[in-house]
């Protein structure tokens, strides 16, 4: 990699904003606690919680849903554009968490208006304190990611995941909020470790070819979907995302020799070894992300499983940025997309 290419990789707003993620976590954690606790009190009184978002925000909603279900709280993650199909006529005990970076996209505002019409309780999680979602919900949790000049959401997504962790952990009542704050601050240093190894990703990015298949289980399935979206948004590449075991139920049939498979290996990925053996029969272009030196991209250890999605998504963001630059494209300004979908 020559100096020009190296500088190009790192001169994008997308990469600079990835670099700001440790600071984003610290600033957000120090800012949102009182509002998170207000949201917790509202959810504790509910019968069911809907978590609504679009694109990257929907992937954060999926992770929040899993956390709430593990805590014994009924929850459903719904895409903003689909929310009207899920709304029950009974408004008693309904809480809707609306997640949006901008707080101004048409679909999320339509979802809020439907909540207000039906009398649902509402919680907003945005990066924009003066947005329609922030000002129109009962409880507003504002992340402190700062302005995102790249169209691809990176640091705002990490901030959403931190808020999700704080909220779900507080609902669990397994510890004091101060303990959760300390764990969040600790994850910032782990992120810095991953970012500091970004030079390792340039050759990997260059070798990504064909269609990209992202595989992950549980919360890492949500981040597999996020990885697929990032490469579609920035690098114009065709992608898919599946749970590990599900990929063997049909989709593997169309895997080609020049396709790339990126596997997010979690703590309980039971299908991992079997899947690697099967995949290696059809493509040699396999990138693994996990905890241990045997993985293509090793992730630092983290004692809190609920924070794993943050660590796994960082290298994917970096790979997407690097691959896009390799292709001669601008990850900050995809030609058909806008930051706020009207």
Segments the model singles out, each with a brief description of its role:
Residues 32-192, 217, 252, 260-304, ...:
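Glycine-rich phosphate-binding loops that contact phosphosugars or nucleotide phosphates
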Residues 2-23, 123, 147-156, 302-313:
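A cross-family phosphate/adenosyl-ligand binding-site feature
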Residues 11-14, 60-64, 224-226, 230, ...:
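Conserved phosphate/anionic-ligand binding catalytic regions in large, soluble enzymes, centered on
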Residues 15, 176-181, 202-203, 328-334:
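Flexible, glycine/charged-enriched surface loops at secondary-structure junctions
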Residues 3-47, 189-196:
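An N-terminal, well-structured beta->alpha segment
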Residues 7, 185-186, 327, 331-342:
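A short, charged, Gly/Pro-tolerant segment at domain boundaries
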Residues 186-207, 230:
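Accessory alpha-helical/coil subdomains and C-terminal extensions
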Residues 208-273, 278, 282-285:
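Acidic catalytic cores of enzymes that act on phosphate-bearing nucleotides/polynucleotides
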């Amino acid at each position: 990699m020559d100096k020009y290419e190296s500088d190009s990789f790192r001169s994008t707003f997308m990469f600079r904003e990835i670099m700001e993620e440790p600071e984003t976590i610290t600033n957000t954690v120090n800012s949102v606690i009182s509002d998170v606790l207000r949201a917790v009190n509202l959810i504790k009184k509910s019968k069911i919680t809907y978590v609504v978002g679009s694109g990257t925000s929907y992937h954060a909603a999926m992770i929040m849903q899993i956390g709430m279900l593990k805590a014994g709280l009924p929850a459903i993650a719904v895409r903003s554009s689909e929310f009207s199909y899920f709304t029950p006529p009974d408004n008693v005990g309904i809480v809707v968490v609306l997640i949006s970076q901008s707080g101004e996209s048409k679909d999320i505002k339509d979802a809020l208006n439907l909540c207000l019409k039906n009398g649902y309780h509402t919680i907003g999680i945005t990066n924009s304190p003066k947005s329609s979602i922030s000002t129109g919900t009962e409880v507003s949790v504002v992340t402190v990611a700062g302005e995102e000049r790249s169209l691809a959401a990176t640091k705002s997504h990490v901030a959403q995941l931190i808020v999700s962790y704080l909220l779900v952990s507080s609902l669990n009542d397994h510890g004091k909020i101060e303990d959760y704050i300390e764990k969040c601050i600790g994850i910032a240093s782990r992120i810095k470790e991953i970012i500091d190894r970004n030079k390792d990703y340039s050759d990997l990015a260059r070798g990504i070819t064909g269609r990209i298949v992202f595989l992950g289980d549980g919360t890492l399935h949500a981040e597999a979907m996020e990885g697929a979206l990032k490469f579609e948004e920035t690098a114009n590449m065709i992608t898919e995302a599946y749970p590990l075991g599900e990929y063997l139920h049909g989709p593997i049939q169309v895997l080609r020799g020049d396709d790339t498979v990126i596997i997010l290996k979690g703590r309980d990925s039971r299908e991992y070894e079997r899947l690697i053996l099967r995949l290696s029969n059809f493509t040699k272009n396999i990138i693994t992300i996990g905890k241990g030196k045997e993985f293509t991209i090793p992730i630092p250890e983290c004692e809190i499983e609920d924070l794993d999605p943050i660590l796994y998504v960082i290298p994917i963001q970096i790979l997407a940025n690097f691959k896009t630059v390799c292709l001669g494209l601008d990850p900050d300004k995809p030609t058909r997309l806008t930051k706020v979908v009207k």
